[in-house]
């Protein structure tokens, strides 16, 4: 399949260092957005014996042998596999999390030097090729970097890794090059669909890159900055974009997320918003979910606004959007037994009317309502139930938003209650994996019941406010 015809994602990422989070955990989170509104997703666990030993891509002619002894890992693949697996994200049995990918931008100068590789790797492949084989976030960067050097890529992507201690962000550069940054423990990132890494230090252990990246920049006069030309390297300036599209599609998302998380600024179109922000308060899972569901609330750019103009409502691309296929918040907790550390908070469908569920990842199966989505509509599956709720909610947001808010408060409280109880009684369980698998069943049951109840209440409320009505009756 030609590069220009391949499917492209369109996501938003949030990264949180362990000292920036409320409980000392690391978090990497992303909306898995697509190019069309519906694309059913599944939540599964891959056992070592199920991992292929020889991999063949669907969208390219890439083939390679994979190492022996893979780790168990979770993933959220497409239900319809005609364009590949697209695992999106997961946590492995070493409690290493990976999210892949955030589509980013590039420029013709680097592509003229290091063109894309027609039969290289892409988003459909990366989790399968990396996550089962790494035991730290840094190892994830190293393995992916080596794969990029060997096989190349046909698209620009950002990839996140986390373990108990570290959060890393890697961005591909051209066909074979890459750069990665360790996010400081006290900081966070809100990353849209552009090249995000700004200041880069080649002589620092918290930065990693292709071995010849600095030489590539210097020898080919790629650095556009005057100030500190020989020592200052802003990779967004060198390899990325600063376009009109960025000013309406990308930068406003970063601006809104940073404002909400405590780093306010005035200009939503600013091309120089920082990549990394020091946290001004401790960040919760609920904070991350709000950012990834947001649509410029309390600003004149809200598509659901009632006091702004039609032009203002359509000016910027919101983070929460109809093309949200799923959202994951991969949390690696400290100060708990290893089996409890990896938590994959997960929701399907447009984020305005869904809820994230804290699924444990040291498991041997996933709940059927999250595992068994098909391409055909089926409201007994959480993907389709969430999609139904989102469509109805979008029809009259102001009418339904209070129901949504109450629903989210109550469901998140219930999930925390189940999680606290599961954590508390974990040591008494004889079969730890079976115990956590059953806890996930309890979480899924509560989630499905709550989502069904929300939809029912929305139908009842909406039926009394339909346009097709007449106030006289018999």
Swiss-Prot record:
It holds the Pfam family Peptidase_C69. Its EC number is 3.4.13.19. The keyword Protease applies. The active site is at 11. It catalyses: an L-aminoacyl-L-amino acid + H2O = 2 an L-alpha-amino acid. One of its GO terms (biological process) is proteolysis. InterPro entries: C69_dipept_A-like (IPR047804), Peptidase_C69 (IPR005322). The keyword Hydrolase applies. GO terms for molecular function: cysteine-type exopeptidase activity; dipeptidase activity. Keywords: Dipeptidase, Hydrolase, Protease. Belongs to the peptidase C69 family. PANTHER family: LD30995P, SECERNIN. This is Probable dipeptidase B. It comes from Lactococcus lactis subsp. lactis (strain IL1403) (Streptococcus lactis). The lineage of its organism: Bacteria, Bacillati, Bacillota, Bacilli, Lactobacillales. The gene is pepDB.
